[in-house]
From Swiss-Prot:
Positions bound to Mg(2+) 1: 576, 580
Designated name of the protein: Ent-cassa-12,15-diene synthase
Note: Ent-cassa-12,15-diene is a precursor of the phytoalexins phytocassanes A-E. Phytoalexins are diterpenoid secondary metabolites involved in the defense mechanism of the plant and produced in response to attack (by a pathogen, elicitor or UV irradiation).
Catalytic activity: ent-copalyl diphosphate = ent-cassa-12,15-diene + diphosphate
Gene Ontology molecular function, alphabetical: ent-cassa-12,15-diene synthase activity; magnesium ion binding; terpene synthase activity
UniProt tissue specificity: Expressed in roots and stems.
Induction text: By chitin oligosaccharide elicitor and UV irradiation.
Amino acid sequence: MMLLGSPSSGGYGGKFAGASPAGGTTTMAPSAKQPSSRAPPPGITGGRNDLRILSPAAAAAAVGGLEMKKPEAEGIAESLQATHRKELEASIRKQLQGVELSPSPYDTAWVAMVPLRGSSHNPSFPQCVDWILENQWDDGSWSIDGSISTANKDVLSSTLACVLALNKWNVGREHIRRGLSFIGRNFSIAMDDQAVAPIGFGITFPAMLTLANGSGLEVPVRQNDIDSLNHLREMKIQREAGNHSRGRKAYMAYLAEGFGNLLEWDEIMMFQRKNGSLFNCPSSTAGALANYHDDKALQYLQSLVNKFDGVVPTLYPLNIYCQLSMVDALENMGISQYFASEIKSILDMTYSSWLGKDEEIMLDVTTCAMAFRLLRMNGYDVSSDELSHVAGASGFRDSLQGYLNDRKSVLEVYKTSKHSISENDLILDSIGSWSGSLLKEMLCSNGKGTPGREEIEFALKYPFYSTLERLVHRKNIVLFDAKGSQMLKTECMPVHDSQDFLALAVDDFCISQSNYQNELNYLESWVKDNRLDQLHFARQKITYCYLSGAATTFRPEMGYARTSWARTAWLTAVIDDLFDVGGLEQEQENLLALMEKWEEPGEDEYYSEDVKIVFQALYNTVNEIGAKASALQGHDVTKYLVDVWLHVVRCMKVEAEWQRSQHLPTFEEYMESGMVSLGQGCTVMSALFLIGEKLPEGIVELEEYDELFRLMGTCGRLLNDIRGIEREESDGKMTNGVSLLVHASGGSMSVDEAKTEVMKRIDASRRKLLSLVVSEQEGPIPRPCKQLFWKMCKILHLFYYQTDGFSSPKEMVSAVDAVINEPLQLRLL
């Protein structure tokens, strides 16, 4: 895995590999010796802002905010598919098999300062001292990436730490002089309150300045500036002096090298992990070891120095988090299907670590939440009990991430909280409550340009169960951080070659859009060819119907499934309009009679031209889909399609009769019909047999199928009712789930209270549906088929969660444009 590194005497190309805890390999990023100034060292083809999409058109479209026009997209797709797509996939596949970490000059310097036990004048790790001597940039600094054109607080901190390490062992006087000169030239950055700072910079940097002065080093800066930083440090310490929370103690232990003799070392070592480290952080462990001898801590550092040949990363081990982050990125960008076997291997290893309560997962809030979410959604049996330590806000605040109010950790646990599969999952519900509130507070307290703000806003507005996959993919591609580094105590560079991920995702999305546009053109022709556009009563929503299929069944080979989904969804809407608002009773009865016969009628059998148009379109479309599906399945499935249509239309007729007679059914009677009449069962079944899975004969008679349908139908019916009640009541329609609950209460329940009750039922059904879909137990219905029910549920949540998106002419326009029409516009990386 190629990540930018610092220069090293060994030259580029050498890797220091070893077995990682969760499988695969972990290696240190390669580096080169003594580059000139801050130009990229030999062997690096460009800085971190380069985009490695080799097609010129693709590169132009992916950087600089240029629009990717349709002809360009087609050319890019052809070029990438022909010459580079396989290379991109091979590169990503290799990255998934092993993790490469960035060298950390800051952490290496602190490890270098650990004295040899019994000989305080000698280093325990002379290899680290050698690495520092061999890896100074020509401007005098030490940093991960010498191609950075400007200094920052992280580079200042790393440079001062390296200077202290060399001075401690009285070597490298010229290196020290140049390092101090770099610090002096750029010291104004340390005084800038607005500059991005590593975690604990206000504690560790002044402490290092004091250590430098105490060891006889003359830092070429004004004493007033040093005094000012020390004063701010003392204020920070005094402000928290009365805070004895576990989170505060964790923070002090994490900054062990900066707090030094202010710490109670016996208390600090309570945070030591089984591998001997403090927080898997070499600098924290070295800071403790310099003041408190511990054999396990020494062994931890020794293992890292040996493993990485004299240099250490800023965190280790980090394998599980790195690999899960890559899996998450692939899923979020819509390209995970190309790496199914690699992802399964990663998740299998993660699950084994989960069951073994591996500290790399359990002691890191972000990793634990991400592991839970990815494992659950991929069918592994995981319990939210393992998240009980952050069930309340106080538990989160007791962690290091909680004390730091870490945005990424809060967002991760919030997203995870929405993956509940039981209405009694109090842990996830509690996590969702406090983390959602905290995210809203972050939005209020931070400006509009705050990093990650758009991601937080999206997560709060659209829980994962009310999103369409292709919409999410586009958002993540557009917002993708190709640099991807994370600022800890020092900068931690990305764990994978982000450009490869972005290049493949852009290519895949552009190909998809081209397919979608062609398929939508076909559907619009289908509407006209079948004269469906002549139906005055019907909502002309073929684009929205296609959106729901395209945004979920998005793989290129699923084109026929998408168009079948869209045509079926549109026909259910048309027939619903015929029974609900646009048709005479005789027309409704005539259509049902024709469907029950299911044969080509004579001209005199149609009550009206509208019935003729509707039935002919339905008859021809269902038979066509049925023939295609039957050929794929090896047995007749047309009968299932006809039967489900009959069930839907009969329920529509029952509800039409209720409306004409002003009959108010019980809520239970209404739901028995209503969860069918919405028509999702027809839509799902139209694609069920077309996605490449072999299904048993009699599938619709299975108990599991019936339960999947019931739960999906319940969500759909009630979501539709809760958003349509005002409109339907104004039209004089009383057969609505909310209205029926109010009526059944005898006036004791208000409309708002009835809506709350309906939302509870939706929530319970959705959770139960998800539990069936992600169940580890393999039943007769393959998981990809069960996922169609879940995807339909998500579509219904998006369409109806906040408004009646299907009936509103404007609500879905932006979604249609984003998935189908608008070219990608990527930010300058």
